[in-house]
Amino acid sequence: DLAQPFRYMCHNGEINTYKGNFSRMQIREELLENEVFGEDLQKILPIVIPDKSDSASMDMTLELLLATGRSLPEAMMMLVPEAWEKHTFMDEDKKAFYQYNSCIMEPWDGPASIPFTDGKYIGALLDRNGLRPSRYSVTKDGYVIMSSETGVLEIDPENIQMHGRLEPGKMFLVNMDEGRIVEDD
């Protein structure tokens, strides 16, 4: 019941806001409406299943957001937003995205590093507190390695294109269809 990975994400950390997130998702179930699903919407309830882990519940919530047509990066940004409220240098469109979506979904705050994939995208997001390490290496021959620490795989130093680490609230994202790293601006 508590095994990972789940459908879309895995999780290194703890969702400190889990009880509140779980309660709000239960309340939302009573308010859900959808023209496409109609009465069949009841078949997907409950969204979050009692007695599952914080990670499992977050994955179930992510699955719901994806079923509404959102992309995986968009849904992850809704669940684990940056600290945007007082960010003076953030792009106004990005800030508007966070402000709008804060009315739809409250943050699932960690400390957490959350890798995720749907086959088109693979990435990881570090919560806004930034208390879980996430380091990555990109090789010249096309590999991306991410872990909580460097050196988990032996890589010829001549083959390293770049090293980095996730910053608090930031996302590392690879578009698998295009074979490229998507910058988090």
Predicted regions, residues:
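Conserved short alpha-helical segments that host acidic/polar catalytic motifs at enzyme active sites
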Residues: 1-185
